[in-house]
């Protein structure tokens, strides 16, 4: 997979949004209603408002990193204090611009980078979120699990990482609607999660964090992990 990493960590929303960004805004508005509303509840069996949004709201710190912000739904609905420093990360610039546009914070910072690689900044975040991101990454489950190994180096000693993703393996049998949706997103190349499973993700979290909480709701793996297992060099930098 070819990826691009930009080390400029002070990107703000370009006021002259391109046609591509405008098109994607409509695309992602549909996503917000369809995926976070209908599909999450009725296909994956995990209500966004009942399970995911409450976890997000309970785990936002004073220096927060949101990875793969999409429509900015969680950032708008998450009750983030005005005093919280907010950074958005995405691989694609149009998606990053859209997140900055819709997050409700004019002072939010944008970071264009590949989450599969170590972050090109030295910031230490006390909270990191990634909701409905991992199942969209075209990578092996091993590479996805490695995200937790390198992102912990950008977290404070008491930092928290939390999120959720749709599993492709070791979950309940899909109903007719879920099977229809799953076939569609796999065929379209939106999902890359055939081997994504709760065991591997939980193992990776426990290898890199002292405290780990996970559960599977329907077909969705929900996680919260805190107190990253940092080495001496990381502790000296904090």
Curated annotation (Swiss-Prot):
Pfam families: Methyltransf_11. Belongs to the methyltransferase superfamily. It comes from Penicillium aethiopicum. Keywords: Methyltransferase, Transferase. SUPFAM superfamilies: S-adenosyl-L-methionine-dependent methyltransferases. The keyword Translocase does not apply. InterPro entries: Methyltransf_11, MeTrfase_VrtF, SAM-dependent_MTases_sf. GO terms for molecular function: S-adenosylmethionine-dependent methyltransferase activity. It is an enzyme of class 2 (transferase). GO terms for biological process: methylation; terpenoid biosynthetic process; viridicatumtoxin biosynthetic process. The gene is vrtF. This is N-methyltransferase vrtF. It comes from the Eukaryota. N-methyltransferase; part of the gene cluster that mediates the biosynthesis of viridicatumtoxin, a tetracycline-like fungal meroterpenoid with a unique, fused spirobicyclic ring system. The first step of the pathway is the production of the malonamoyl-CoA starter unit for the polyketide synthase vrtA. The aldolase vrtJ may be involved in the synthesis of the malonamate substrate for malonamoyl-CoA synthetase vrtB. The polyketide synthase vrtA then may utilize the malonamoyl-CoA starter unit, followed by sequential condensation of eight malonyl-CoA units to form the polyketide backbone. Its EC number is 2.1.1.-. Pathway: Secondary metabolite biosynthesis; terpenoid biosynthesis. Viridicatumtoxin and its derivative, viridicatumtoxin B, exhibit anti-methicillin-resistant Staphylococcus aureus (anti-MRSA) activity. Moreover, viridicatumtoxin and a C2 acetyl analog, spirohexaline, have been demonstrated to inhibit bacterial undecaprenyl diphosphate synthase, a potential new target for antibiotic development.
